[in-house]
Swiss-Prot record:
Zinc finger boundaries on the chain: RING-type: 357-390
Keywords for this protein: Cytoplasm, Jasmonic acid signaling pathway, Metal-binding, Nucleus, Transferase, Ubl conjugation pathway, Zinc, Zinc-finger
Cellular localization per UniProt: Cytoplasm; Nucleus
Descriptive protein name: E3 ubiquitin-protein ligase RGLG4
Tissues and organs where the protein is expressed, per its UniProt entry: Widely expressed.
Reactions the enzyme catalyzes: S-ubiquitinyl-[E2 ubiquitin-conjugating enzyme]-L-cysteine + [acceptor protein]-L-lysine = [E2 ubiquitin-conjugating enzyme]-L-cysteine + N(6)-ubiquitinyl-[acceptor protein]-L-lysine
Biased composition (Low complexity): 8-19
Reported induction: Repressed by the mycotoxin fumonisin B1.
The organism's place on the tree of life at top rank: Eukaryota
EC code(s) of this entry: 2.3.2.27
This protein's encoding gene: RGLG4
Length: 401
């Protein structure tokens, strides 16, 4: 059975019924409090539900099991939102997995982001009934860790994943990769979409190459500003009918993302999961088997998250508290100078260019590492490996002018 046919078994109607459900080892009886049962208050029931879905385990071993659980939960379709990471680290996290090239490099061979978007389209798009996919980029020199940009200047969604790929290929060459990495603004944008769509269930898929930015000299348990922003956004998103799937591309490292749930304080339900796309797609298996494994990993927790949204009464809920997010337009294409404008001999880079931090591209370099490369102090305090040569940073020398 192809992935498309498998997922089309869910049907095309946007059913939001909360009929009795049997998911894994949970009871088949509804968890809604009975109006005739005065012993269980609404608050007690809600607290019990939060505890039940505080950490959702991976309980399925096949797509058929996921299919059955989704049908029993009443989830016949969903709405996808896509976010793409354009931070500076994409330039070096393809050293092993993409022949040393930037993960966003376009050419005859599909880059990891193109592959991930294609496979997501093959495996998850059949969930999306209307085939309208809001798409955002983040981490470039226009958004940094504070905003997102839309794939269309009018912020309209893409019509299917073919258009998603076409827009990505049009946008990628125009970008200046930057950072630092925070998923907070993207998650806030997804929450805003859920709110504006009257609490319909959505799945946010984030395709990214790295963990949230964290300084090497930070104490255990201490959080960077980007980690705080991301965690706050995830906690806030758990009050909405939204599941978050982080799809990791490139070399990683991904250790912190696998443990990220442990850093997140009490939520309404466990709404975040990580899938290592590189690990799955480099297995020695047929392509169809790898796509199936990816779909299983990405969909594993969706049935439980949807059931949690029902029991917590998040479906159809509008809080009136969601941040209103206005995405920036996609980056403007870079126009190189014409031959008439070019000097007769090559000119050396200006002092401003050579002294700009290679990560944020705005601040001046004022910190040197033991390898000899330099960044600005702000960016240099948040990385553990040199962004140029990838050597581990053991010393930082502050430079004064």
């Amino acid at each position: 059975m192809t992935m498309g046919n498998f997922l089309k078994r869910f049907g095309s109607g946007k059913s939001r019924s909360s009929r009795n459900m049997t998911l894994g080892t949970t009871s088949s009886q509804s968890h809604e409090p009975s109006p005739s049962d005065p012993s269980l208050s609404l608050a007690d029931n809600t607290n019990a539900t939060k505890k039940k879905y505080a950490l959702i385990p991976d309980r399925f071993s096949s797509l058929d099991q996921v299919s059955k659980a989704l049908r029993e939960a009443g989830l016949e379709s969903s709405n996808l939102i896509l976010g793409v990471d354009f931070t500076k680290s994409n330039e070096w996290t393809g050293k092993t997995s993409f022949d040393g090239k930037c993960l966003h490099a376009l050419g005859e061979t599909s880059n990891p982001y193109e592959k991930a978007i294609f496979v997501i389209g093959q495996t998850l798009a059949p969930f999306d009934e209307d085939n309208l996919i809001p798409c955002f980029g983040f981490g470039d020199s226009t958004t940094h860790d504070e905003e997102v940009f839309g794939f269309h200047s009018d912020n309209s969604p893409c019509h299917g994943f073919e258009e998603v790929l076409a827009c990505y290929k049009r946008i990628a060459p125009n970008l200046r990769l930057s950072g630092p990495t925070s998923y907070g603004p993207l998650i806030d944008a997804a929450v805003d979409i859920v709110e504006k769509n009257n609490g319909q269930f959505h799945v946010l898929v984030i395709v990214a190459d790295g963990q949230v930015t964290r300084g090497t000299d930070m104490a255990e348990g201490e959080l960077s500003q980007q980690e705080k922003t991301t965690i706050d956004a995830i906690v806030n998103a758990s009050s909405y009918a939204l599941s978050i799937v982080l799809v990791g591309v490139g070399d990683g490292p991904w250790e912190d993302m696998r443990k990220f749930d442990d850093k997140i304080p009490k939520r309404e339900f466990d709404n975040f999961q990580f899938v290592n796309f590189t690990e799955i797609m480099t297995r020695n298996s047929p392509e169809s088997a790898k796509e199936t494994a990816f779909a299983l990993a990405a969909l594993m927790e969706i049935p439980f998250q949807y059931q949690a949204a029902i029991e917590l009464r998040l479906l159809g809920k509008q809080t009136g508290l969601a941040k209103t997010i206005v995405p920036r337009p996609p980056p403007i294409p870079y126009t190189p100078p014409t031959n008439a404008e070019l000097p007769s001999t090559a000119s050396p880079a200006s002092p401003e260019q050579t002294q700009s931090c290679p990560i944020c591209l705005t601040n001046r370099k004022d910190v040197a590492f033991s390898c000899g490369h330099m960044t600005c102090g702000d960016c240099g305090s948040k990385i553990s490996n040199c962004p140029i040569c990838r050597v581990r940073i053991t010393n930082r020398l502050k430079l004064y002018t």
